[in-house]
């Protein structure tokens, strides 16, 4: 069921991105934002490269955070972290009680993903989680007319659009994700690079 709520200008949002894949353990960084204007906190944890622990690690990171009770939404940069460590967005929503918005710069190539998953003994399980994330929708935020692609759990389309427009103040990517990416790559590589 999609929750419908009033989107306040200073809604607390947690944006999560991963770092570069340098080791078996991959750092994930969460930034807590008030709307798209300012950062209130930073969370970090580690997931297994190509593992299946991303959902569980994110749930624990969020529930153990002092920010947990103030958070209203989780934003993810896609649903695969640390290689092919797939996040079950329905479970993330259910376990945290927080709606989940997935943001992607481009629409995934499911044929390539399906082909890559053949190299995993549990590829079918990962594929089911990917398909379970639901329909991918195209959204234009107003920033240069550049589209982004979204998936969602526990939140309606109108609120997703409001939140993305509120937080996409410097690019088509919402600030919580853009800044999480900068922090994660900066810590891992010594300098931030690439795009969220």
Swiss-Prot record:
It comes from the Archaea. Gene3D superfamilies: archaeoglobus fulgidus dsm 4304 superfamily. Pfam families: DUF99 (PF01949). Belongs to the UPF0215 family. This is UPF0215 protein MM_1007.
């Amino acid at each position: 069921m999609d929750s419908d709520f009033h989107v306040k200008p200073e809604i607390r949002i947690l944006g999560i991105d991963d770092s570069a894949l340098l080791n078996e353990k991959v750092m994930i960084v969460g930034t807590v934002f008030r709307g798209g204007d300012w950062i209130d906190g930073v969370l970090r944890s580690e997931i297994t490269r190509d593992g299946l622990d991303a959902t569980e690690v994110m749930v624990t990171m969020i529930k153990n955070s002092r920010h947990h009770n103030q958070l209203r939404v989780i934003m993810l940069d896609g649903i695969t972290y640390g290689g092919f460590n797939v996040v079950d967005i329905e479970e993330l929503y259910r376990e945290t009680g927080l709606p989940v918005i997935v943001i992607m710069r481009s629409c995934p190539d499911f044929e390539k993903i399906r082909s890559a998953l053949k190299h995993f003994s549990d590829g079918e399980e990962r594929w089911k989680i990917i398909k379970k994330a639901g329909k991918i929708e195209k959204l234009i935020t107003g920033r240069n007319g550049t589209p982004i692609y979204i998936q969602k759990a526990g939140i309606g389309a109108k609120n997703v659009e409001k939140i993305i427009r509120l937080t996409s103040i410097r690019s088509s990517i919402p600030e919580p994700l853009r800044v999480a990416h900068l922090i994660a790559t900066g810590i891992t590589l010594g300098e931030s690079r690439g795009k969220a």
